[in-house]
């Protein structure tokens, strides 16, 4: 069995373990400040490292927790991560994170679904501060200011709305990183989480190209991108190439599921989409499946559909998963036992499981 098969089979079991676990709230309290950073670390590059260092210096006596997706190893774009989350967690702790916890299965969810899950995780962690990188954009500073005033900011198609005041703050399509910030504000407001003065906004640094890093991973040559990533990331990518799962899929699973499942039952697939794909059966290879998927609103739509065909989660199960999330907190890596004890006293759940 391949590494990818082992990971995806295990993660399907873990998904249903989450689903079967009852939420248990904790009565513990702690004045210790917790900084929770959602980040994919795909892989951990200088931009991530800069954000971590700024957050740590802003709240020096704090617990830095990285929330790293997650089950099925598929990114928000629906494509396979470069490294499994355990390796990403290892790199993060070596560079300054205190604890890394498992985030939601981004690549199998719609953007609103995983944004809601992440915000529920922030609440469960009893988060005091949330660092977030952003790209400077005309008019965006006012949006950031409103968010840190605790206003309910919501992204709409080609505009950003302050739902607290009813104003349209921006008429434009946001870049992905900036969109995530407004989506967080919207989801945090929906669950009643008070985020006034809790965001630490960090201006993105230059000199990092995700495209070039992915090309280097594909080619196995990192000399051209060594200045974009910390030495630890380069070390893992160079010395542990067997762990690299980038661009790898279980093609046979995708083809078999596309041919045989009732696609309308799966998360992300509505009646129209399911019928359109099913009408082009049978499929003999991955390209035929990919070509049968119409282009959606998102540029990454096709890859997300491939991911759900690869790891078929029914709509009902995903809905129940989101409703209970996080039914347990899985720790992927932690700095030491003292940090772990502080973490357990801080968070709002008794269901804490460590893979260490």
Where are these regions (language model features)?
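Active-site cores that bind ATP or allylic diphosphates and position pyrophosphate for catalysis
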Residues: 2-32, 78-79, 95-356
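N-terminal catalytic cores of NTP/NDP-binding nucleotidyl/phosphoryl-transfer enzymes
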Residues: 20-84
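Conserved structured core elements
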Residues: 46-49, 86, 179, 207
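Generic structural signal for well-ordered alpha-helices
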Residues: 52-53, 89, 119
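Short, structured active-site "lid" loops
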Residues: 85-97
């Amino acid at each position: 069995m391949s590494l990818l098969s082992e990971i995806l089979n295990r993660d399907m079991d873990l998904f249903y373990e989450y689903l079967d676990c009852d939420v248990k709230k904790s009565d513990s309290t702690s004045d210790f400040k917790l900084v929770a950073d959602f980040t994919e670390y795909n892989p951990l590059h200088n931009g991530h490292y800069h954000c971590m260092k700024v957050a740590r210096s802003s709240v020096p006596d704090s617990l830095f927790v990285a929330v790293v997706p997650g089950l099925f190893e598929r990114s928000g774009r629906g494509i396979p991560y470069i490294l499994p989350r355990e390796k990403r967690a290892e790199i993060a702790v070596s560079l300054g994170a205190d604890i890394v916890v498992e985030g939601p299965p981004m690549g199998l969810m719609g953007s609103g679904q995983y944004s809601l899950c992440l915000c529920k995780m922030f609440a469960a962690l009893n988060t005091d501060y949330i660092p977030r990188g952003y790209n400077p954009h005309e008019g965006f500073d006012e949006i950031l200011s409103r968010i840190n005033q605790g206003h309910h900011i919501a992204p709409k198609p080609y505009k950003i709305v302050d739902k607290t005041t009813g104003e349209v703050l921006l008429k434009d399509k946001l870049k992905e990183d900036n969109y995530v910030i407004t989506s967080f504000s919207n989801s945090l407001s929906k669950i009643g989480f008070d985020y006034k003065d809790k965001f630490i906004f960090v201006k993105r640094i230059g000199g990092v190209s995700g495209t070039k890093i992915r090309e280097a991973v594909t080619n196995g040559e990192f000399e051209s991108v060594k200045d974009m990533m910390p030495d630890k990331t380069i070390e893992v990518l160079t010395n542990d190439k067997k762990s690299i799962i980038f661009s790898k899929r279980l093609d046979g699973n995708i083809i078999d599921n596309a041919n045989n499942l009732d696609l309308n039952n799966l998360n992300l697939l509505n009646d129209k989409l399911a019928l359109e794909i099913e009408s082009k059966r049978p499929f003999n290879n991955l390209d035929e499946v990919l070509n049968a998927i119409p282009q959606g609103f998102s540029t990454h739509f096709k890859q997300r559909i491939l991911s759900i065909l690869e790891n078929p989660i029914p709509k009902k199960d995903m809905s129940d998963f989101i409703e209970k999330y996080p039914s347990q907190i899985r720790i992927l890596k932690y700095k030491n036992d003292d940090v772990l004890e502080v973490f357990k006293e801080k968070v709002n759940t008794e269901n804490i499981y460590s893979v260490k």
